[in-house]
Amino acid sequence: MGELRIGKVEKYIHEKLEKKKLHFVLIDPDDTSPEVAGKLARVCEELGVDAIMVGGSTGAEGEVLDNVVRSIKDNSSLPVILFPGSHGGISRYADAIFFMSLLNSRNPFFITGAQALGAFTVKKFGIEPIPMAYIVVEPGETVGWVGDARPIPRHKPKLAAAYALAGQYLGMRLVYLEAGSGAPEPVPEEMVRVVKSVIDVPLIVGGGIKSGEQAKKLIKSGADIIVTGTAIEKAKSLEEARKRLEAIRNGVFV
C-alpha cells in the first residue's frame, strides 16, 4: 500500500508553527490583476508573510487564475496555496491546494461534490492537497451565500467546536473558521478559544480582520494562522497595503 506522506507545503506550515504564529494573505483573482498580485506578493514577502492563498468564493478559474498565480510565483518565493470556491479554482502553477469541505453547507456539492469533480485535476497537475475542514460563521458574507451554508451563530461556540472536531476525526489536518470576506467583525474570540480547546490540528481564522489589534486578540484566543484579504485589496495604493499588512503582521507576531 502506498504510504501517505505529508507534502512540502504542509510540512513548511507545521515547522513554522513550532516557532511562531503565521500570517497568510488571500488574493482574489477576480479583484486583482496579475500585475498588482505580483507587487503585493513582493510586499508580503518583504514583510514576513508566511504564504499566499489564491482564490475567492465567486470562483475565478482558467487563464485568469493561472496568470495571477504565475505572477505571484515570479515575484516571490512564498508558497502559493489555492483556496478554491469550486472545482474550477485549480491552477497547475500553484504549490498546494486547501482541499476543503464546507462542513456546514446544506448542499452536498460543497461538502463532497466539488471535491470529487476536482480530485483528478489535482492529481494530474501534481498539486499538493492539504485536507481542511472549512466552517462558515455568521455573517458568512458571499461565501456563506454561494456555499449554501448554515452559518454558525456567533453566540454558539460549542457548535463550531463540534464541527471542528468532526472535521479532525474525519481526517482533516487543518480547521478554518471563516466569518466571510469583508465581514464587519471577525470570528468571536470566545469561539476561537472553545474550538482550539478541543482540536489537535492547527486552527486558521479568516474574515473581517482589519487591524493588528483584532489579529492579536484572535492569536491570544488560540488561532494559529490568521488570514487577511479584503483589508489589503481595499487599499488605495501599494503603500497603504504595506501599512495595513504591517499593522496586522505586528498583531500576529506578538
UniProtKB/Swiss-Prot annotation:
Cofactor(s) required, per the database record: Mg(2+)
Gene3D superfamilies: FMN-linked oxidoreductases (3.20.20.390)
SS bonds (residue pairs): none
Subcellular locations according to the entry: Cytoplasm
One GO CC term on file: cytoplasm
Swiss-Prot/TrEMBL catalytic activity: sn-glycerol 1-phosphate + (2E,6E,10E)-geranylgeranyl diphosphate = sn-3-O-(geranylgeranyl)glycerol 1-phosphate + diphosphate
Highest taxon above the source species: Archaea
NCBIfam families per UniProt: GGGP, GGGP-family, PRK04169.1-2
Function according to Swiss-Prot or TrEMBL: Prenyltransferase that catalyzes the transfer of the geranylgeranyl moiety of geranylgeranyl diphosphate (GGPP) to the C3 hydroxyl of sn-glycerol-1-phosphate (G1P). This reaction is the first ether-bond-formation step in the biosynthesis of archaeal membrane lipids.
Family of the protein in this entry: Belongs to the GGGP/HepGP synthase family. Group II subfamily.
Name of the protein this chain belongs to: Geranylgeranylglyceryl phosphate synthase
Organism: Pyrococcus horikoshii (strain ATCC 700860 / DSM 12428 / JCM 9974 / NBRC 100139 / OT-3)
